[in-house]
Amino acid sequence: METSLSGIRVGMISLGCSKNLVDSEIMLGKLLEAGAVLTASPHQADILLINTCGFILPAKKESIDTILAAIHRRTTTSKKQKIVVSGCLYQRYGKELSALLPEVDLFLGLDDIPKIDLYVKQLIDTPPSSKEMPALNFSPRFIPDFEHPRLKLTPSHFGYLKIAEGCNHPCTFCIIPRIRGRYRSRTIQNVVAEAEAMIRRGTKEIILVSQDTTFYGRDLSNGQSSLLVDLLDSLETLEGDFWIRLLYTHPAHWNASLIEKFSTSKKIAKYIDIPIQHISNPVLERMQRKTEESYIRELLAEMRTKIKNAAIRTTLIVGFPGESEEDFQKLCSFVSSFKFDRLGVFPYSAEEGTKAEKMNGQVPEIVKKRRAKKIMELQKEIAKEKNKELVGKTLKVLVDYPGVARTEWDCPDVDALVHVPYHLPPGHFTEVKIVDFKEYDLIAR
């Protein structure tokens, strides 16, 4: 039976990562397919959908603050707006959140995403006194599908393609497996069909995301091996001039065939996103990262040798329980010597429900922040060195907005920018000459 939401104005506030953004796009696609219309002004919406993040404390605080601000705005304007909350925060806290925020009209879990149009229609038609929330499935099975309608929230020339959902890793600092469930892959055919549709709509950059892209397909092959290279082979056969960018690769699952694929492909961006988290063995062991220092060093060295002109990006955690000054100095030394092309660092966040939260040796907040600052000071100097080497070179860039572009070494909203002449058209590749730089960004003409 078709659901009619004709004329209902829907607003969206999407928080958190690119994977959550894909969920937001699917929910909007379902609502618009049912007749709703999108408004860019949350206060004008009949239905305000807030898709939350619940990963670490700052993200949880942002989600709660956003919900409270929406409730306050509705109260002060006397608007009969319905507030719908979805995403990781609710999936993680369930009844606790609904008890804390009774003003929210509807909470939706991950498995409710494909049925959001039905729940919103029911919300509109049901008197407030008899509202009933859908039962929350704490072992979600939802996987994005090519058949799901989707309203892209990114510029038309790039988009995120979620190839899998969930995670099987036992990292002691992370709550994601508890929130998102076990790893479950889409089929190669399903992913390729969506990529084809994106290219037909003018997409120039397809960004593959999941909790661990290098784990892709292991659940489809009884855990024997990843199917990521097979997926990349299929995507490379698609016609058109576009980049394929991979995010969230796990160092434990890289292999020779994947390195070979990166080194020979003409469509895969020479951009390796590989969060190592740390280099000290005692810390890696407590994190349960399934890697060790010697393996990480050898893998990164092999990448540098075999994948020419690649940018290697990593993410680090400092202040993990038990991280000694010696552990931290080893990390600093490694960052200084290896010279990552792109790097991000997070002070450890103790998350309830994780093994690390209960570990001895919790590091004071002031020490965590000082260590994170030190790492970024090192990286800033490295970035200046690398940018200085690019002055005078001609690079291919993708123009995002008037005056702003990116190289294949830069992911949207995460990495550096190239400042280009304003007349260059957004959504197109072009070549520019680098004439200067400022810290992380390049300046071109």
Swiss-Prot record:
InterPro entries: Elp3/MiaA/NifB-like_rSAM, Methylthiotransferase, Methylthiotransferase_CS, Methylthiotransferase_N, Methylthiotransferase_N_sf, NA-bd_OB-fold, Ribosomal_uS12_MeSTrfase_RimO, rSAM. [4Fe-4S] cluster 1 binds at C17, C53, C88. GO terms for cellular component: cytosol. It is found in: Cytoplasm. Keywords: 4Fe-4S, Cytoplasm, Iron, Iron-sulfur, Metal-binding, S-adenosyl-L-methionine, Transferase. Its EC number is 2.8.4.4. SUPFAM superfamilies: Radical SAM enzymes (SSF102114). Binds 2 [4Fe-4S] clusters. One cluster is coordinated with 3 cysteines and an exchangeable S-adenosyl-L-methionine. Residues 8-125 form the MTTase N-terminal domain. Residues 153-385 form the Radical SAM core domain. Catalyzes the methylthiolation of an aspartic acid residue of ribosomal protein uS12. NCBIfam families: 30S ribosomal protein S12 methylthiotransferase RimO, MiaB/RimO family radical SAM methylthiotransferase. This is Ribosomal protein uS12 methylthiotransferase RimO. It comes from Methylacidiphilum infernorum (isolate V4). The lineage of its organism: Bacteria, Pseudomonadati, Verrucomicrobiota, Methylacidiphilae, Methylacidiphilales. The gene is rimO.
